[in-house]
Amino acid sequence: MTAKLIDGKAIAASLRQQIAQCVAERRQQGLRAPGLAVILVGTDPASQVYVSHKRKDCEEVGFHSRAYDLPASTTQGELLSLIDRLNEDSAIDGILVQLPLPVHLDASLLLERIRPDKDVDGFHPYNIGRLAQRMPLLRPCTPKGIMTLLQSTGANLYGLDATVVGASNIVGRPMALELLLAGCTVTVTHRFTRNLAEHVSRADLVIAAAGKPGLVKGEWIKPGAIVIDVGINRLDDGRLVGDVEFSSAAARAEWITPVPGGVGPMTRACLLENTLHAAEQLHR
């Protein structure tokens, strides 16, 4: 068996086209373009790349984008004041604080300061709670994007045994909630899990999101499983690889995401989708 690739790049491009069409229709109706404010603190190279991609995405779909590139010395109070101003700005539908932040800043406090209806990353406790209560409002972008990728396969998720490798607040935990909502039986593994191979090998669906290259061995994959690799790790030789041993896993799985070009593009596209949703449904 050779797995079919889930082309996140192509699916994300299609989603961006749909969003751009919606924005164009809004403009024709005399409505404003959705607005996204992106806050970057410091000069972390990876964060700068991510933010530049997000701003480019906004331009592509016709969003109003506002950039706040702040020095690493920015204080907690200054950031809280900025978020307060953006919360009250009617031209802004979404506020994004790029993580990680400098060590002197409390990310949790800052993310909680964002109004839940402008929390387009979906990290606010209110939005996570809504998801847990089966009433999602603004859903975390990476899990939301993964659900779109899974839908593209045509697979019936009801009753599938799903194993999530990694329990972060950004991916693993909200991913488990999304899968529960979709009717899966979910196991979440983490750094204290014993017999990881056993949990993976019985899964019909594997979501690998631990941030450790090659953690999930191809021989663990159940024949015919769906494998979603969230990890993106740069090796010493410069190659980008996921958390799953791709070649050996692809020989056993039915569907698999590549790295890069799988989950990453969908995360960015879902940020746009959340911002459009906020503009159309929450800020009318």
UniProtKB/Swiss-Prot annotation:
Keyword NADP: yes
Entry keyword annotation includes Disulfide bond: no
Cysteine-cysteine disulfides: none
EC number(s) stated in the UniProt entry for this protein: 1.5.1.5, 3.5.4.9
A Pfam short name: THF_DHG_CYH
Pathway listed: One-carbon metabolism; tetrahydrofolate interconversion
GO biological process: L-histidine biosynthetic process; methionine biosynthetic process; purine nucleotide biosynthetic process; tetrahydrofolate interconversion
GO cellular component assignments: cytosol
This protein's UniProt keywords: Amino-acid biosynthesis, Histidine biosynthesis, Hydrolase, Methionine biosynthesis, Multifunctional enzyme, NADP, One-carbon metabolism, Oxidoreductase, Purine biosynthesis
Domain of life, per lineage: Bacteria
NCBIfam families: PRK10792.1 (NF008058), PRK14186.1 (NF010783)
Subunit comment: Homodimer.
Function: Catalyzes the oxidation of 5,10-methylenetetrahydrofolate to 5,10-methenyltetrahydrofolate and then the hydrolysis of 5,10-methenyltetrahydrofolate to 10-formyltetrahydrofolate.
Family of this protein: Belongs to the tetrahydrofolate dehydrogenase/cyclohydrolase family.
PANTHER family: C-1-TETRAHYDROFOLATE SYNTHASE, CYTOPLASMIC (PTHR48099:SF5), C-1-TETRAHYDROFOLATE SYNTHASE, CYTOPLASMIC-RELATED (PTHR48099)
Name listed for the protein in its UniProt record: Bifunctional protein FolD
Annotated source species: Azotobacter vinelandii (strain DJ / ATCC BAA-1303)
Source species taxonomy: Bacteria, Pseudomonadati, Pseudomonadota, Gammaproteobacteria, Pseudomonadales
